[in-house]
């Protein structure tokens, strides 16, 4: 064990500069594409500071989109005593989820949202105009080199056009309406190289289905992906949008493609269409009276292409994955899991009968997808006993498909049309899977119960495979597909290289003068005894049982009594003992409290806020893990619970205290929660150091992410709601 003295300059190994262990950033350090885009939208940074993966930053995004959930966001916004939007041009409302629902209740909700948009001058797209993500792209809100967020998990979609898109929660959306900004921890960044060229009949959908199936061990969980490689230029923009869209299912929080000449040509086509359509139909406030479209215009495109945002040579990535596109054949995802991907030829014998087929969603229902399905079904009929549902990604898409004759081709084949919107993809409206049925869909999720009955089976595939299956009644490829001409590989060629290994011992000096001062009122140190839960994927239900979730009158004290009940029934009592025995703080700048340690993906599962507040109410001000579930992270920091990632510390704790030296088996002492006697932890908020004192003589210091200024702002104001009120 080595103690690190307090010196003016510290020497640390290069591995400590990983996404979770960076001490500081110099101006000369190369940045990734994601880091560069975030740099443009980060506010409140000290002069000369370059953002890095792992940093907590305050972001002022270009736009924030909400859909049917705009209603609850309005309620949250008004509950904060907000009367006006910080910037009416920033939000975009697009009603797209429950568009088939003509009930009085739903129509009243939609009218309320429209009235709010009109009152505040927000761009509003009514039900039937299309899926929000498609609108954000085709109306130019998402733009190369920009950052756009939405209160929907498929915001990754915008990465298909070189725009950093990521999901936020509803409270964040209300905060952006009020203040123009939200906090974000820049995730670890993974490079995915797509090499070679797809064979005829293989599509972008096959690429992402294969990636999610091949790399199914959480290689990109909660990461931001940057796509590179020689194969990118051969992918159409629609294919890139499909791939970026489904990086969500792969586990990533963003997936961004580079800006290239193919994207420029695509946008030139979009601009021509916008001009032909007079761009202001339907009218939205941002275009009223404009002679030139405020987003879709040649000058803006020229600027984006001339000043392309690209990664610096030598930029650091947490891992590098690669897939040889030339070795890929059509793939099918499922049943009922995106982590299971099978080459289409392997599913042909014995045949798998289907009951329903779907060409809907923001993933694969653009004009090129509809054309692909129409080519397969031209002159054919949907098989007897099969229902084939189609819905365009937007009304603009449907107009294009109708003009090309493709929409009518599908109708003539027996397809049943639905309005432009989400529909069956999210289990709303007509045509859902019934008990015992099998469906194949060009959508993005096939989780059990997602598209109907939990007793149904769902597969995902490309539009051509979906259409061919609808015509034949079994899962199959188009008749034009010659299997003998496809790449003859048992599986595609792929690889993974992890960077930042602990074996790299290049010393890096850290200058104390580069450290940013902490906000007044934020603790310089967190210090106290530790509790170790040696468990990966500890769910929010384990932290706070569902049976308490809707007890709205439950007190903070009661939350503390049931915290971690489903994981360890003795946890609450253990935490209480530590809380009552806390010594006096070693200095006025130190916040005393027990500190919880656990494994990876801590807080996976449902979005219940009480999982975070129960831990905080149990006297635990800070949690240290290998990684956190993204929504849990947002809920925690929004409620003043500090989270720190330190994989090296968790590794040592696991080896020393977990049964058999691995997590998920409890502790060596037979307990689910380990409390090492006499051990204490001290977290240095400013430097990103975690010092573990193992008694009077021994201690060891670990690198961790520093507590960023954005998190400090929320904490000193008592959480997100207090921060918003203080900002008004």
Swiss-Prot record:
Main location: mitochondrion
Keywords attached to this entry: Amino-acid biosynthesis, Iron, Iron-sulfur, Lyase, Lysine biosynthesis, Metal-binding, Mitochondrion, Transit peptide
Domain of life the protein comes from: Eukaryota
Cofactor(s) this protein requires: [4Fe-4S] cluster
GO biological process, one term: lysine biosynthetic process via aminoadipic acid
UniProt subcellular location: Mitochondrion
Cofactor, free-text remark: Binds 1 [4Fe-4S] cluster per subunit.
EC number per UniProt: 4.2.1.36
Keyword Endoplasmic reticulum carried by entry: no
N-terminal signal peptide: none
Catalytic reactions on record: (2R,3S)-homoisocitrate = cis-homoaconitate + H2O
Residue stretch of the organelle transit peptide: 1-24
GO CC terms in record: mitochondrial matrix
Cysteines paired by S-S bonds: none
Positions contributing to [4Fe-4S] cluster binding: 362, 422, 425
Keyword Repeat: no
Pathway(s) annotated for this protein in UniProt: Amino-acid biosynthesis; L-lysine biosynthesis via AAA pathway; L-alpha-aminoadipate from 2-oxoglutarate: step 3/5
MF (Gene Ontology): 4 iron, 4 sulfur cluster binding; homoaconitate hydratase activity; metal ion binding
Function text: Catalyzes the reversible hydration of cis-homoaconitate to (2R,3S)-homoisocitrate, a step in the alpha-aminoadipate pathway for lysine biosynthesis.
Similarity comment: family membership: Belongs to the aconitase/IPM isomerase family.
Name of the molecule in the record: Homoaconitase, mitochondrial
Organism: Cryptococcus neoformans var. neoformans serotype D (strain B-3501A) (Filobasidiella neoformans)
């Amino acid at each position: 064990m080595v103690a690190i003295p307090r010196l003016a300059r510290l020497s640390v190994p290069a591995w400590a500069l990983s996404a979770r262990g960076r001490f500081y950033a110099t101006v000369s350090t190369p940045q990734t594409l994601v880091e560069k885009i975030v740099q443009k939208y980060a506010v409140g940074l000290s002069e000369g500071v370059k953002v890095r993966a792992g940093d907590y930053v305050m972001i002022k995004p270009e736009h924030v989109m909400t859909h049917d959930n705009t209603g609850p966001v309005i309620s949250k916004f008004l509950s904060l005593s907000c009367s006006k939007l910080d910037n009416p041009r920033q939000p975009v409302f697009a009603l797209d989820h429950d568009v088939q629902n003509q009930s009085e209740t739903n129509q009243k909700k939609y009218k309320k949202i429209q009235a709010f948009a009109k009152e505040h001058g927000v761009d509003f797209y009514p039900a039937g105009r299309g899926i929000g993500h498609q609108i954000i792209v085709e109306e130019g809100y998402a733009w190369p080199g920009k950052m756009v967020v939405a209160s929907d998990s498929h915001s990754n979609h915008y990465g298909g056009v070189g725009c950093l898109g990521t999901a936020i929660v509803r409270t964040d959306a209300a905060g952006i309406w009020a203040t123009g900004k939200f906090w974000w921890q820049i995730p670890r960044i993974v490079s995915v190289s797509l090499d070679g060229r797809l064979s005829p009949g293989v599509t972008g959908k096959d690429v992402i289905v294969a990636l999610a199936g091949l790399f199914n061990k959480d290689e990109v969980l909660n990461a931001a992906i940057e796509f590179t490689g020689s194969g990118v230029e051969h992918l159409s923009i629609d294919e890139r949008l499909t791939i970026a869209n489904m990086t969500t299912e792969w586990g990533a929080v963003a997936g961004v493609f580079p800006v290239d000449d193919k994207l420029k040509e695509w946008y030139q086509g979009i601009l021509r269409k916008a001009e032909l359509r007079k761009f202001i139909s339907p009218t939205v406030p941002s275009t009223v009276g404009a002679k030139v479209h405020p987003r879709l215009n040649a000058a803006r495109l020229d600027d984006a292409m001339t000043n392309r945002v690209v990664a610096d040579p030598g930029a650091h990535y947490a891992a590098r994955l690669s897939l040889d596109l030339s070795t890929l054949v059509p793939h099918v995802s499922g049943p009922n899991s995106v982590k299971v991907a099978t080459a289409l030829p392997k599913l042909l014998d014995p045949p798998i009968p289907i009951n329903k087929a779907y060409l809907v969603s923001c993933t694969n229902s653009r004009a090129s997808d509809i054309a692909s399905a129409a080519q397969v079904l031209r002159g054919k009929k949907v098989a007897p006993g099969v229902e084939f549902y189609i819905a365009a990604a937007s009304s603009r898409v449907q107009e294009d498909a109708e003009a090309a004759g493709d929409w009518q081709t599908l109708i003539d084949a027996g397809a049943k049309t639905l309005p432009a919107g989400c529909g069956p993809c999210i289990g709303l409206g007509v045509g859902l899977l019934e008990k015992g049925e099998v469906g194949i869909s060009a959508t993005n999720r096939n989780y059990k119960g997602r598209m109907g009955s939990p007793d149904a089976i769902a597969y995902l595939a490309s539009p051509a495979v979906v259409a061919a299956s609808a015509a034949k009644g079994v899962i199959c490829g188009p008749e034009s597909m010659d299997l003998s001409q496809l790449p003859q590989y048992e599986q595609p060629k792929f690889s993974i290289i992890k960077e930042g290994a602990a074996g790299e011992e290049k010393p890096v000096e850290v200058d104390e003068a580069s450290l940013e001062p902490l906000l007044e009122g934020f603790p310089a140190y967190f210090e106290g005894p530790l509790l170790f839960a040696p468990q990966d994927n500890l769910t929010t239900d384990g932290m706070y049982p569902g049976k308490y979730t809707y007890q709205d009158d439950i007190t903070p004290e009661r939350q503390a009594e049931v915290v971690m009940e489903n994981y360890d029934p003795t946890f609450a009592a253990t935490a209480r003992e530590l809380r009552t025995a806390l010594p006096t703080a070693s200095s006025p700048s130190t916040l005393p409290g027990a500190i919880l340690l656990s494994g990876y993906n801590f807080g996976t599962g449902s979005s219940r806020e009480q999982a975070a507040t129960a831990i905080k109410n149990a006297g635990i001000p800070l949690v240290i893990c290998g990684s956190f579930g993204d929504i849990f992270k947002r809920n925690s920091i929004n409620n003043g619970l500090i989270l720190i990632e330190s994989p090296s510390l968790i590794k040592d704790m696991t080896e020393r205290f977990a049964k058999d030296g691995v997590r998920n088996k409890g502790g060596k002492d037979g307990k689910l929660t380990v409390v090492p006697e006499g051990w204490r932890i001290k977290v240095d908020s400013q430097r990103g150091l975690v010092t573990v004192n193992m008694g009077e003589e021994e201690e060891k210091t670990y690198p961790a992410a520093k507590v960023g200024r954005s998190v400090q702002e929320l904490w000193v104001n008592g959480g997100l709601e207090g921060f918003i009120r203080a900002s008004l």
